[in-house]
Structures are given as C-alpha cells and as structure tokens.
Regions:
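Divalent metal-binding pocket/active-site signature
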Residues: 28-137
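Short acidic/histidine-rich active-site segments
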Residues: 93, 125-126, 171-193
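Mid-to-C-terminal alpha-helical segments outside catalytic/metal-binding sites
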Residues: 173-175, 190-232
Length: 232
C-alpha cells in the first residue's frame, strides 16, 4: 500500500483506497487486482475494523514501511469485496518468492476461512508452490478459488511436471492456468513456455492413458489459454 495513506485519517484512507481500486477497473481498464501481502505481513489475515483502526496508528516499522498488520489485513478484505462487486479476479501471491518473502506465512491454506463463503474469484498465483497441494484442494473445495502455475515455470525446472501432475490430480481442470511470472529478460518467457508445453503434454498423455480424461488436446488448450481467457 502507498505510505501516503498514513497521512490521512483512517476513514479517509480507506475511502481513498476503495475509490482508487474502482477507478483502476472502471476508468483504466485493469483486468483485476493483485496482493503481495505475503511479502509484508503474511496470509494469516484477520478482517477486523477495530484492529485495523488501532494498527493504523501504530508506528512500528519494517523494511517496507509501517507494519500496520491489522490495517493491511483490512484493506485485503476490502479488495476482496470490491473485486466481487466489480466481478474481476483477485490474484494473491502464495508460496515461494524472492528472498524477502515470509515463506512460513505464505501457505494458501491460511486463506481458507476467507474464501469458504466468498462469491468472487480468487487466484492463488504460483499455485502456492511448494504448497501447491493446498492450492489444488482449495480449488477443488471452494467455487471461488482458482490457481495458476506462474513462477513454477521456469524456476522450478523439472519439478514443474510434478507440480502440474499433482495439481491436475485434484483441482478441476477449468480452474488451472498457465503463467510464467517472467520479467526483464525475454529468454525467461521462452524457457517458461518451452518447459510448460513439454510437461503439460506429458501429463495430459498420462491422464489420457489412465482414462482420467478422454481428450488430452482439449485439456492442454484449457490450461494453456482458455481458462485464463474466460476468467480475465
């Protein structure tokens, strides 16, 4: 969140945050929202306005700025509400990341109570790897939950095949999406696509041989592009 929010009164800060989100969709044609709260205060999120008000005034600092966990949690919950209101996906970073990630607080399952009755669309990006089985089960259990395998390809290299296999064993196929999480170097995108195409083909062939699916090409196309096109 922008540190300038802390220069406003609590109610004004929340109002400004909400209006900014709505404008991004309505006026700037954003496709959805993304949270990296896993990098800040983790995914053990509590939606409590009183706690948010108290933490808003707390001046405890972290490397990223004011900690204000209760306030950050509250804005996360507000984002869920607005994403549902505007019918756009809300991506949430889960699992491993850069060296500043709070990995012990980034397990997808920490979001279980928040998504249990949620009627919007939550995307667990990076499939929560290495906690991808949790993401797959959540996608199976809760209508609101989707996942993508960005970052797994190419950074998990050959483990990407295992991740795809394990995710597709549990999650509905129409809830799994390819992604790369690539940046800066175009070669990373190329390697990601190359590995994904290889392993999704191998996994789909295995599933067809085991008679779990009857059309491997359809499954490949769904995960590679169709699911994301429908969601976004």
């Amino acid at each position: 969140i922008n540190e300038k929010l802390f220069s406003l009164p609590f109610d004004k800060a929340v109002e400004f945050f909400e209006e900014t989100l709505r404008n991004k969709i309505r006026k700037e044609n954003y496709a959805g929202f993304k949270s990296i709260i896993a990098y800040r205060t983790g995914l053990k999120i509590i939606c409590n306005e009183d706690l948010a008000r108290n933490d808003f005034l707390d001046e405890e600092m972290e490397w990223f700025g004011r900690k204000a966990k209760g306030f950050r949690d509250y804005l996360f919950c507000k984002t869920m509400e607005i994403a549902k209101e505007l019918d756009v996906p809300f991506q949430v970073h889960t699992g491993a990341g850069d060296r500043d990630i709070k990995l012990e607080l980034s397990r997808p399952s920490y979001l279980t109570d928040l998504v249990r009755k949620y009627e919007g669309k939550i995307v667990l990006v990076h499939a929560g790897f290495p906690y991808h089985r949790e993401s797959a089960w959540m996608a199976y259990l809760f209508p609101s939950v989707y996942l993508d395998v960005s970052q797994v390809f190419p950074f998990a290299t050959t483990a990407g095949k295992d991740v795809l296999r394990e995710v597709l064993q549990i999650s509905p196929i129409n809830k799994v999406m390819y992604g790369s999480d690539t940046f800066e170097l175009p070669e990373i995108a190329w390697v990601s696509a190359k590995l994904f195409r290889k392993y999704i083909t191998e996994v789909a062939e295995e599933m067809e041989r085991e008679e779990i699916i009857d059309d491997k090409e359809k499954v490949i196309k769904m995960v590679a592009e169709e699911n994301a096109s429908k969601l976004y």
